[in-house]
Amino acid sequence: MSTLKLNPYFGEYGGMYVPQILVPALKQLETAFVEAQEDDDFKAEFTDLLKNYAGRPTALTLTRNLSPNPMVKIYLKREDLLHGGAHKTNQVLGQALLAKRMGKKEIIAETGAGQHGVATALACALLGLKCKVYMGAKDVARQSPNVFRMRLMGAEVIPVTSGSATLKDACNEAMRDWSGSYEKAHYLLGTAAGPHPFPTIVREFQRIIGEETKKQMLEREGRLPDAVIACVGGGSNAIGMFADFIDEPSVELIGVEPAGKGIDTPMHGAPLKHGKTGIFFGMKAPLMQDSEGQIEESYSISAGLDFPSVGPQHAHLNATGRARYESATDDEALEAFQQLARCEGIIPALESAHAIAYAVKMARECTKETILVVNLSGRGDKDIFTVSDILNGKEV
């Protein structure tokens, strides 16, 4: 048995703020993860699934028409091409293998845009695990294609009507369920947030994104990019891209939060720049709170970014200045969604469109030869009806 212990904190952020009943389950998970990371057979099986089931490595595509500046190259890391349609599949396969290693028979998950739910459903179908997915009722309505996909693959999808009926409420219900079933079930958390050891586990299973990007950039350009850019909700696709570049000081790390209707309105989801530190979802992290410390509702056109907090490592990277966090509005994301489709023939997820929007803005302002890499974290099939309704002037 390994004696290695993971650090539960990133600076002042992170920790394990959960009911005492869940502490043994989290410690069991930490031990299993550490041992798995030292087990060549586990790593070989995970790598094989990523390659021969999920389709890694994913392409690094140089856009031909997106950049508004001839001095700026914009590359896309194509996680939209991964089986399941988004980056979520990477770490879900890892956690599902961990669950089997621990002898668990059931998986509990939460989902916002439905991409994590789809990834969890496909992993459970593949590995013979029972699957239960909690999803905010609003998200069930706006992500009906993904709901059908989950059910088609055998998952039980449970709409959550409490609170704002979005991702944070689905997270709360999933955690509540796990509190009573952890002996037989594994909670397969979908982002790099929540109680320790989830932020570290998710980062390590998503790290492949940045590792591949670094290798591909050196092959294509003979150097590292000037910046890597990713959207940030909970933060898993961004930390997957950032992880292998954190120790490369020449590479700027840029996260893009959802500004919603505008940062100066109550309708946004940007806790890193506009939140206050608090305890939520088992961790200490920036949180959208009112003057009395109550959790404020987050808002984003993209269900996957509609979250009032953020992963603790992003909070630490922001606090230390290693990463820079910007924001993009609904309108900017919608414009980028259409622009990428028209310019490159690629339909991005609305989440990813936030990062595209900022990359185009940044490219416009560059005054020297620059290489940007955007993590195209998912494809936009799930969003076409939402966008169509908005463009046709319907209420969404």
Curated annotation (Swiss-Prot):
InterPro entries: Trp_synth_b_CS, Trp_synth_beta, Trp_synth_beta/beta-like, TrpB-like_PALP, TrpB-like_PALP_sf. The keyword Amino-acid biosynthesis applies. Its EC number is 4.2.1.20. One of its GO terms (molecular function) is tryptophan synthase activity. The modification N6-(pyridoxal phosphate)lysine is found at K88. Keywords: Amino-acid biosynthesis, Aromatic amino acid biosynthesis, Lyase, Pyridoxal phosphate, Tryptophan biosynthesis. Its cofactor is pyridoxal 5'-phosphate. It is an enzyme of class 4 (lyase). GO terms for cellular component: cytoplasm. It catalyses: (1S,2R)-1-C-(indol-3-yl)glycerol 3-phosphate + L-serine = D-glyceraldehyde 3-phosphate + L-tryptophan + H2O. Pathway: Amino-acid biosynthesis; L-tryptophan biosynthesis; L-tryptophan from chorismate: step 5/5. Belongs to the TrpB family. The beta subunit is responsible for the synthesis of L-tryptophan from indole and L-serine. PANTHER family: TRYPTOPHAN SYNTHASE, TRYPTOPHAN SYNTHASE-RELATED. NCBIfam families: trpB (TIGR00263). This is Tryptophan synthase beta chain.
